[in-house]
């Protein structure tokens, strides 16, 4: 079986490429060209026939990933399945199943059955969890068990994986030599891999046997998302030498993976101050050959716990604007607790708004929906306005809960409604289209 990137290089427009082109209003040949170049990926494990086709990358609508998963403290398969269903209902594009407690195979399989979204994971979680259960010591992890586990997970139908290939002895040495890390290590999988390397004195097998990782991913046409295990967990650590060392390696691996016919994506931070986000995107795009960039937020302040879905949305709007391709949501529970169903819904909504704001800036020719919404608001055509809103159900419920006396207005202004008064003054004078320059 050939992967999407191999088919594209052979000049073949696959069914999945056709679907992405139709969904995004592109000529299929443009999609094929960008898939061939590694600028667009399409997670599409053939073992999962009910999966929604989603394109991620250059020129496409910025996509949203939402994550779920059990922990050692809270472990309910039913809860995670309900969260997965809620995430799909709210409009996320991809889902990561990141369980670390309970029957991990069962959680993954139930989630895969419950939704149609492309599903990914971090295989190191289960690898270290099961090793810890067996030996009471995660550092006893056998690399052969890890590779067997990756294939087992892929065979279930996972379409992308965050795999920490960029951590190696060199990146760890950079971290030790710089002598500081205000936020420590923020990646669970990355931290356990560093601990394994420290305990064994060996190189990271995911880096050392990178070709083997690519072979497994190619077998299932899954996207290899190069995880950032040394990412900054505090804005004061942003772009330190350790993070940059891993980023350089990941960007190099993205190129090597593409050469082997593997669909590749690079993961980004993390915690990044607002003034550094653009530079971060430029660096990844330049060094990776424009590989799709999967950004975890980013979170541009460290003091927003309880409202980090808002903190992250601000960073996500900026990173989307500057070229990020896939944004991982953050929920209000981030840094505090395992999220509830209500938390994941709120996280998707905040991120949905953030990427819309970012896409308006990234693609100025895609603002028509905003224009139509504005005109409907101006004319007090409430039913028409709802058709153009990101969250029509919320808008409808809020307005109905405090209904105005005049059905054309709302209770914010009542008799002082600027829209109503403006329509009385100007009637049809301001209802024409703007004349384009030079027309």
Swiss-Prot record:
For the ligand (substrate), the binding residues are: 96, 125, 164, 187-189, 228-231, 267, 294
Please give the SUPFAM superfamilies that the UniProt record associates with this protein. Cobalamin (vitamin B12)-dependent enzymes
**Example GO molecular function:** 4 iron, 4 sulfur cluster binding
> Per its UniProt record, what InterPro entries does this chain match?
Cbl-dep_enz_cat (IPR016176), ThiC/Bza_core_dom (IPR038521), ThiC/BzaA/B (IPR002817)
**Catalytic reactions on record:** 5-amino-1-(5-phospho-beta-D-ribosyl)imidazole + AH2 + S-adenosyl-L-methionine = 5-hydroxybenzimidazole + 5'-deoxyadenosine + formate + L-methionine + A + NH4(+) + phosphate + 2 H(+)
Residue ranges the record marks as coiled coil: none
What EC class does the entry list? Answer: lyase
Q: How is the cofactor bound?
A: Binds 1 [4Fe-4S] cluster per subunit. The cluster is coordinated with 3 cysteines and an exchangeable S-adenosyl-L-methionine.
What Gene Ontology cellular-component terms does the record carry?
Answer: cytosol
Residues holding Zn(2+): 271, 335
Q: Name one GO biological process term.
A: cobalamin biosynthetic process
Report the domain of life of the source organism: Bacteria
Q: Where does [4Fe-4S] cluster bind?
A: 410, 413, 417
Q: Which UniProt keywords apply?
A: 4Fe-4S, Cobalamin biosynthesis, Iron, Iron-sulfur, Lyase, Metal-binding, S-adenosyl-L-methionine, Zinc
Required cofactors, per record?
[4Fe-4S] cluster
Write out the function statement from the record: Catalyzes the conversion of aminoimidazole ribotide (AIR) to 5-hydroxybenzimidazole (5-HBI) in a radical S-adenosyl-L-methionine (SAM)-dependent reaction. Is thus involved in the anaerobic biosynthesis of the benzimidazole lower axial ligand of the cobamide produced by D.autotrophicum.
By sequence similarity, the record places it as follows: Belongs to the ThiC family. 5-hydroxybenzimidazole synthase subfamily.
Task: Report quaternary structure and partners.
Answer: Homodimer.
User: Which PANTHER family has this protein been placed in?
Assistant: PHOSPHOMETHYLPYRIMIDINE SYNTHASE, CHLOROPLASTIC, THIAMINE BIOSYNTHESIS PROTEIN THIC
- What is the protein's name according to its record? 5-hydroxybenzimidazole synthase
Organism equals Desulforapulum autotrophicum (strain ATCC 43914 / DSM 3382 / VKM B-1955 / HRM2)
């Amino acid at each position: 079986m050939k992967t999407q990137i191999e088919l594209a290089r052979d000049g073949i427009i696959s069914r999945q490429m056709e679907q992405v082109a139709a969904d995004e209003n592109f000529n299929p040949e443009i999609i094929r060209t960008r898939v061939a170049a590694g600028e667009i990926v399409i997670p599409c494990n053939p073992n999962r026939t009910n999966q929604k086709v989603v394109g991620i990358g250059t020129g496409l609508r910025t996509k949203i990933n939402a994550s779920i998963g059990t922990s050692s403290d809270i472990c309910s398969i039913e809860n995670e399945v309900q969260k997965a269903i809620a995430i799909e209902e709210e409009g996320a594009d991809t889902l990561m199943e990141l369980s670390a407690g309970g029957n991990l195979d069962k959680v993954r399989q139930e989630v895969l059955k419950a939704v149609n979204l492309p599903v990914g994971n971090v295989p190191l979680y289960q690898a270290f969890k099961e090793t810890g259960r067996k030996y009471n010591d995660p550092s006893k992890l056998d690399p052969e068990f890890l590779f067997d586990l990756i294939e087992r997970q892929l065979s279930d139908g996972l379409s992308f994986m965050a795999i920490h290939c960029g951590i190696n002895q060199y990146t760890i040495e950079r971290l030790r030599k710089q002598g500081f890390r205000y936020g420590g290590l923020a990646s669970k999988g990355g931290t356990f891999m560093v601990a394994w390397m420290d305990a064994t004195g060996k190189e990271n097998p995911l880096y050392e046997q990178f070709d083997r990782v690519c072979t497994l991913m190619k077998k299932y046409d899954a996207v290899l998302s190069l995880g950032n295990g040394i990412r900054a967990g505090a804005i004061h650590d942003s772009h330190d030498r350790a993070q940059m060392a891993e980023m350089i390696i990941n960007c190099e691996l993205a190129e090597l993976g593409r050469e082997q016919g593997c669909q590749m994506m690079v993961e980004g931070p993390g915690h990044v101050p607002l003034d550094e986000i653009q530079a971060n995107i430029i660096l990844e795009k330049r060094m990776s050959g424009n590989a799709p960039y999967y950004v975890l937020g980013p979170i541009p302040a460290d003091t927003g716990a309880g409202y980090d879905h808002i903190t992250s949305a601000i960073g996500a709007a900026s990173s989307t604007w500057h070229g990020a391709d896939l944004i991982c949501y953050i929920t209000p529970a981030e840094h505090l607790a395992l999220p509830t169903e209500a938390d994941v819904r709120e996280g998707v909504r905040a991120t949905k708004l953030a990427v819309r704001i970012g896409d308006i800036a990234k693609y100025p020719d895609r603002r028509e929906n905003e224009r139509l919404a504005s005109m409907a608001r101006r004319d007090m055509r409430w039913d028409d306005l709802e058709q153009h809103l990101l969250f029509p159900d919320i808008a409808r419920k809020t307005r109905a809960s405090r209904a105005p006396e005049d059905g054309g207005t709302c209770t914010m202004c009542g008799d002082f409604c600027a829209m109503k008064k403006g329509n009385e003054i100007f009637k049809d004078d301001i209802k024409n289209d703007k004349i384009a320059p030079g027309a």
